[in-house]
């Protein structure tokens, strides 16, 4: 077992006689046999552009990656990762990256991420349209570009304080969503706020116990004044793992329509203090 070199990579790529690449030069080559690369995202990365590039090294040689670039039609720029990472033969490693800003002018059907790997000895592996088995690209592109469209028309955010109604096992948290128009042209329809793995609508006379979203039914344009929307919240579950294992329980999907277009989903902006207050309300109700 050895380290995969530029010359051995090139031999794999063209199946021809090879000689070592000169010191200090780079050799661009195909992905070696047994090595696969794909884009992914862990649950705790959903809040932003953080992602992983998964390298599965099924070859007989170690890979030493000293640089990684992500670019492509899905993005407006290129991101660079210049930390060295070894991927031993027969192993898989996830390399964390911060993806570039989304290219909102690119159609969803044309989204592509390209990955370039720089190896320790100067070899360069370029992968066009890297595999995206969990649909990271359309999810991030849709969310980020929806935020751009919403921000053009209004500032939509959760307020920093949470009001509590009732006490003990009857506690209900009341979250206020504030909507402040920017005065710029456009129409924003706030359709609904969806529940999370941790939080759901509080049942009442008009809300069944199995409700999975809060209907908002608000429209905002340049002539609108500021609006406030209250949503009443209770825990989705009270088992011991609900809070201990939570990573996305306060990330509410907000469904909107921009300028009469199709429904789109973004995450409701939520101050850290508000997220903490909501989790405290869960502790109070669950005991």
What is each PLM-predicted segment?
Residues 19-22:
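Bacterial signal peptide processing site
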Residues 121-212:
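Surface-exposed beta-loop interaction hotspot
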């Amino acid at each position: 077992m050895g380290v995969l070199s530029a010359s051995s990579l090139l031999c794999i790529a063209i199946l021809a006689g090879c000689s070592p690449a000169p010191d200090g030069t780079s050799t661009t080559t195909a992905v070696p046999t047994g090595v696969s690369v794909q884009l992914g995202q862990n649950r705790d990365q959903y809040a932003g552009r953080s992602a992983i590039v998964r390298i599965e090294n099924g070859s007989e040689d170690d890979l030493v990656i000293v640089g990684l670039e992500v670019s492509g039609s899905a993005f407006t720029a290129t991101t660079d990762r210049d930390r060295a990472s070894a991927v031993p033969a027969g192993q898989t490693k996830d390399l964390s990256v911060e993806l570039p800003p989304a290219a909102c002018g690119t159609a969803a059907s044309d989204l592509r991420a390209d990955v370039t790997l720089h190896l320790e000895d100067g070899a360069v592996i370029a992968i066009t349209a890297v595999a995206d088995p969990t649909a990271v690209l359309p999810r991030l592109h849709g969310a980020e570009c929806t935020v751009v469209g919403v921000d053009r028309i209004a500032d939509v955010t959760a307020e920093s304080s949470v009001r509590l109604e009732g006490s003990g096992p009857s506690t209900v948290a009341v979250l206020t969503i504030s909507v402040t128009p920017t005065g710029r042209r456009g129409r924003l329809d706030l359709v609904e706020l969806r529940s999370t793995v941790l939080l759901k609508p509080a049942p009442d006379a008009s809300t069944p116990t199995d409700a999975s979203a809060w209907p908002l039914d608000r429209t905002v344009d340049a002539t609108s004044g500021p609006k406030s929307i209250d949503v009443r919240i209770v825990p989705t579950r009270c088992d011991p793992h609900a809070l201990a294992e939570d990573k996305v329980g306060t990330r509410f999907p907000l469904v909107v329509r921009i300028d009469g277009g199709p429904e789109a989903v973004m995450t409701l902006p939520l101050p850290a203090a508000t997220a903490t207050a909501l989790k405290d309300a869960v502790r109070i109700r669950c005991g």
